Amino acid sequence: MKLAYWMYAGPAHIGTLRIASSFKNVHGIMHAPLGDDYFNVMRSMLERERDFTPVTTSVVDRHVLARGSQEKVVDNITRKDGEEHPDLIVLTPTCTSSILQEDLQNFVTRASLSTQADVILADVNHYRVNELQAADRTLEQIVQFYLAKARAEGEIPDRTATPSVNILGMTTLGFHNQHDCTELKKLMADLGITVNEVIPANASVHNLKRLPQAWFNLVPYREVGLMAARYLETEFGMPYVDIAPMGVVETARCIRKIQQILNQGGASVDYEEFINTQTVHVSQAAWFSRSIDCQNLTGKKAVVYGDNTHAVAMTKILSREMGIKVVWAGTYCKYDGDWFRDQVKDYCDDVLITDDHAQVGDAIARVEPAAIFGTQMERHVGKRLNIPCGVIAAPVHIQNFPVGYRPFLGYEGTNQICDLVYNSFTLGMEDHLLEFFGGHDTKEVIHKGISAESDLTWTAEGLTELNKIPGFVRGKVKRNTEKFARDRGISEITVETLYAAKEAVGA
């Protein structure tokens, strides 16, 4: 457990509740003190849905600490079963309530004797895993539970006559998941593949027994769905594709892998003409990468940071498809760091694997990129350093749950990424116009370091003079001046200090 005011991936129970609330007619019960019950508020605020979040908190209070939790937890499970009539109730503790070391499995067994719904306890170690790992495991657990049930009742169906696919890992609170799901369905329809099931988003647990009838599973996000796909491969011999179709090159690679699996399964398909048509005529990305607009970006420096799926894909797109120099690429998925390093090593100069936001901020400040591609936190860092930022991965705020259609996957996703990349760089003329006519670039310079350890102060005259320096070199001048001041023991930076530093650097 770690005390922090910013986390890239939340605690384990958030992942479990994301999976439970993604399914249709599944209720989550969180055994937790009041401080841990923010999931409902967060989901209700961010997801644009009309229904209430199906999660109830079984509050751990002083009465529970005195008497034990069993009576209260069992009562909450049976009460929700009677009120909501769910198909499944998922009980999860939080890392805080896990300290009590209670036998929650016993509570579940007892409660299930008097409920119509199935009841399971999330099989997650709340001290060792984060939100993404817990989501992956909970999805696998629910799939296992219902397929074991179907197998015992002899209800496992045969494979469909024509090619079909399950899309695994589409969840609530995912980064552009709803739009990505729509785009993947369109892509599968264009390839002549029927979408059998999409889980967990809006899926019924009663339909999970239909999963084995698909020809293969598609796992667009490495973080959630991979464990379920591996289970289905082991138990039912179902192949899976775990290539995220982000960017023209990776989308083509994903489609070719699908083609290989279908042809091995007895189909006879050739998608090369489709790939060529989409790449040349439908997606604007290939044309954009050859245009003068993109050539203006060639050689510009950028940094990339996010979850594994999006950070890897974005690094490859910037480096391989747009000629942008990725100074470093990073991920907060430390548990899967080896895979990340292996994927990006040929496309960037350096790799950063950490979930410490201060370390990420300092790494950005050190290399002074022309643009940042990261999470909501890197957006804040960019504003403090006056560096533009495109948001490419969770965690994100409300502006990355857009009302309009903005997928990141598939061929339409490549167009969206092109727009994001181009609009993230401050163009030269825009910079000058902001200087001439006023705008966001003329406000007072923020003079804090990212780690908030600055021991220097700027006078008003010094800041005014600093503001006169063009935006694209202002950050560098500011840092050089502060280094000059520290070396000479100057605590207050005036106009004279600024000029003295300039002369020292020039000399």
Swiss-Prot record:
Catalytic activity reported: chlorophyllide a + oxidized 2[4Fe-4S]-[ferredoxin] + 2 ADP + 2 phosphate = protochlorophyllide a + reduced 2[4Fe-4S]-[ferredoxin] + 2 ATP + 2 H2O
Cofactor needs: [4Fe-4S] cluster
One annotated GO molecular function: ATP binding
EC number, UniProt record: 1.3.7.7
Similarity comment: Belongs to the ChlB/BchB/BchZ family.
Summary of subunit composition and partner proteins: Protochlorophyllide reductase is composed of three subunits; ChlL, ChlN and ChlB. Forms a heterotetramer of two ChlB and two ChlN subunits.
Protein name listed in UniProt: Light-independent protochlorophyllide reductase subunit B
Provenance organism: Cyanothece sp. (strain PCC 7425 / ATCC 29141)
